[in-house]
């Protein structure tokens, strides 16, 4: 599988602005900020207190099925991920990454601190094959349940990037931690399944274009 788009670590900097920089109050946490809705003014941004840094983990599920090639969807997703990985690396946040493509979702990272190796993987990421997103969500739910038993004080977040182009799916349980679903579906004809998926997961919903408008 070849990479069909380059990741751009600065892709969100124009849109999220200060949400990717550090200020006097501490680093702005853009993922938790987005979980509360689009920030429209400075006071909407959540910052990490400098005096206390509780353990934090971001679990990221990436849909890289063939349909995400359309209209540059994967290219935009890679821009989001490049920035996310860079922010996690700077703040020494732990990551878990699930790659949903082909027949079965695969773990790329499972709770380690962010590393530059993730950027290397991202540069090679291309779209193709089926959409094992349901498998990814089930694996993520099981892994999070075990993680929460092992590390009950850890702050966990789930980020799902997908165009939602599934034929159908059974009822899904709500995610066990604060969650954000980023809809990659673009173009003139949109099925809107990602929004339905977000509702079932109890996740905040954002279209990827919104991340560049903030």
Give the label of every model feature segment.
Residues 14-21, 64-67, 103-105, 122-123:
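Short hinge/gating elements
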Residues 37, 87, 125, 143-147, ...:
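Conserved, well-folded catalytic cores of nucleic-acid-processing
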Residues 212-214:
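C-terminal "exit" segments of structured domains
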Residues 53-111, 114-161, 165, 183-192:
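Von Willebrand factor
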Residues 1-55, 114-115:
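Acidic/polar low-complexity segments with low predicted structural confidence
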Residues 164-209:
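VWA/integrin I-like adhesion module and closely mimicked acidic/polar interface patches used
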Residues 25-29, 53-56, 72, 76-79, ...:
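Charged, alpha-helix-enriched surfaces in structured cytosolic catalytic cores
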């Amino acid at each position: 599988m070849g990479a069909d788009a380059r990741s751009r670590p600065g892709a969100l900097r124009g849109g999220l602005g200060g949400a990717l920089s550090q200020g006097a109050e501490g680093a702005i946490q853009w993922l938790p900020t987005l979980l509360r809705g689009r920030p429209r003014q400075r006071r909407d941004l959540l910052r990490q207190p400098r005096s206390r840094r509780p353990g934090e983990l971001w679990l990221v599920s990436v849909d890289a099925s063939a349909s995400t090639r359309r209209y540059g969807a994967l290219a935009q997703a890679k821009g989001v991920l490049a920035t996310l990985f860079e922010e996690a690396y700077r703040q020494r946040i732990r990551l878990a990454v699930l790659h949903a493509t082909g027949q079965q979702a695969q773990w790329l990272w499972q709770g380690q601190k962010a590393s530059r190796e993730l950027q290397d993987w991202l540069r090679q990421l291309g779209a193709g094959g089926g959409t094992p997103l349901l498998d990814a969500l089930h694996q993520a739910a099981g892994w999070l349940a075990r993680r929460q038993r092992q590390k009950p004080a850890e702050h966990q977040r789930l980020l799902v990037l997908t165009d939602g182009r599934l034929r159908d799916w059974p009822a899904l349980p709500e995610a066990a931690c604060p969650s954000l679903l980023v809809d990659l579906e673009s173009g003139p004809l949109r099925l809107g399944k990602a929004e339905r998926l977000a509702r079932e997961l109890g996740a905040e919903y954002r279209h990827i274009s919104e991340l560049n408008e903030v």
